[in-house]
Amino acid sequence: EILIGLVGSEMCIRDRVNYVPEIHGALRTRIEMNTTQGEYRFQVRNARVSLGGNIASWANYFVQTDLCDQGKMKILDAWARIKPSAQLYFQAGQFRMPFGVETFRAPNNYLFANRSFMGKQMCNYRAVGAKAAYTFAKLPLGIEAGLFSPNAIGDHTGWSKDVAFASKLWYKLRNATFTTGFSSIHPSLVRANLVDASVVWQAGRWHVEGEYMYEHYAHKAHKAAHSYVAFADYTMPVRAWKFNRLSFQGRFDGITAHSSAIAGDDGLLITNNPARNRATLGATISYIHTKSIGLDLRVNYEKYFLHHSTAVTPDLADKAVLELVARF
């Protein structure tokens, strides 16, 4: 009995799991000035809260909601994961489809006040479904793939004969990470297929990224769309009152005429996002307490370059942004 007790205790120590849920979040509040038309607006852009934890050494869960996404409440993520091994896991629920790099950046680690056109307009897909992911033990290589409902995340009751699909492959070589992927969505009457390629380079204080995305619409329902983004971020330690890090950012992004692949009343696709380019310059001073706890004070200036056929609206005008971000 003593031997059994000792063996049992040893197994418990080896299999010790922290079951206490972790709560994290990000609050982004800002003022924007339209420098072209002289208008202002105040926003709570995000009030995001997440809850995650372990059920066992081989299973965990994650739930995330945004209490104020531009004034609206949204349930973003709700999934459970099973990990048969250190290299393999299966995940089911509602979450972001495994496709792209820019789109996976969350509010707590944004480098710019406004997301790129690629991350916000062209590839901003969460869906209900399941995926599998595998990372090779002896190679810096990983792959993810999943099947999803083609319906919007707010509709979990509809039946469909179609599915959406997404996949992602990444490879790391020294300081660079190369990623490519394929996604196929069917949110309305027309299926759209997307391909993506990106490279991320990190060394010392520098972080540089470039990404390209292409979207093709079945049956030539809309002209194919292209999107691209490239940016650089440079950080340095400082001692300025309570702040301890200063960083500078530069970005150039663009998108051609793009449709969300949702048909109008006449059954035809419309152009939801007009063609445009943008250059963004920014600076951020931060208080970094831990990896997940900190405060950012960010200022950005965005210069828009519109095509002749694109009308100037407040959202497409040059703007300055002052933003305060709390991360916990």
What positions do the PLM features span?
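Single conserved hydrophobic/aromatic residue that forms the stacking wall/gate
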Residues: E1-I13
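Outer membrane beta-barrel
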Residues: D15-I153, K161-F165, L169-T177, F231, ...
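Outer-membrane beta-barrel pore domains
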Residues: T35-Q37, A56, R81-K83, T103-R105, ...
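A generic structural micro-feature
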Residues: V17, R41, K72, M122, ...
